[in-house]
């Protein structure tokens, strides 16, 4: 009996009407149960298969010992959807950068970010994974390394989920948080990002509020994303408090005026009840002046929002610099005086080129 491809979308009342496509990673218990039944196996095998994929990290169906040798041989060629490790580097702060090779030979980057106990000793209190959603990035933000290598393609659902399992297996600790802040623009790959979010929540057990999707802002996509009524965190890469400066830093902003972006963010808050986080990379002498902070505070008025300031992480291709601490504190103080919720994030993984804005899917 030859194996049928994976059930990717299942009508639980009529499994035979389901669309069948491989690979298996990203499939739910219901999907896997429907698939094994199509192979002549009992439904409970689907739950076993789910456990082996997500909990045991199996990479080939041929290695699942609870199944008969005959059936394993029949389905051995059906892919689970795991990548191979191309490169791994560790920063002094414990952050790990991974380059993963996909089945078509493309390379993507993933980062594992452990948070330790207060003194930096003992078990890791939290493990965050920064995942990529595209091979490369088409947005070409002026200060970011990710877009310098160009854009190749979207990642499939399984290629996003695989990054989380890779980090989880390497650290031998369950992942607590996932941030979609790696290579690519998530809202240009909405279908696969939504499917990955669902699987990370339901199959791997990561709470929705521990999932963050970052976007530079794509016209109408934030509104569409809100319709899914997820309880994830939306992070918008703003980086400038006015349209003119934003266009210089983010070329795609020319097609999406700041006022329209902010209007969509307000709609997102109204629909989901969740505040929006605005990421703002501080560039010395470019967007870090007190008047910029005052403009930024005005953008935040009228809806639930939080500003996350990120002091710039240098890359070789451009001459931007990180502001000194006095300049950063002055910027923060202006925002606080305007009652704008604000925090400063000093990025982890700087020495491994794994910090915010440094990801490029290369060893250097």
Swiss-Prot record:
It catalyses: adenosine(2503) in 23S rRNA + 2 reduced [2Fe-2S]-[ferredoxin] + 2 S-adenosyl-L-methionine = 2-methyladenosine(2503) in 23S rRNA + 5'-deoxyadenosine + L-methionine + 2 oxidized [2Fe-2S]-[ferredoxin] + S-adenosyl-L-homocysteine; adenosine(37) in tRNA + 2 reduced [2Fe-2S]-[ferredoxin] + 2 S-adenosyl-L-methionine = 2-methyladenosine(37) in tRNA + 5'-deoxyadenosine + L-methionine + 2 oxidized [2Fe-2S]-[ferredoxin] + S-adenosyl-L-homocysteine. Binds 1 [4Fe-4S] cluster. The cluster is coordinated with 3 cysteines and an exchangeable S-adenosyl-L-methionine. The active site is at 109 (proton acceptor), 356 (s-methylcysteine intermediate). GO terms for biological process: rRNA base methylation; tRNA methylation. The keyword Cytoplasm applies. CDD domains: Radical_SAM. Its EC number is 2.1.1.192. It is found in: Cytoplasm. Residues 123-351 form the Radical SAM core domain. Specifically methylates position 2 of adenine 2503 in 23S rRNA and position 2 of adenine 37 in tRNAs. This is Probable dual-specificity RNA methyltransferase RlmN. It comes from Nostoc punctiforme (strain ATCC 29133 / PCC 73102). The lineage of its organism: Bacteria, Bacillati, Cyanobacteriota, Cyanophyceae, Nostocales.
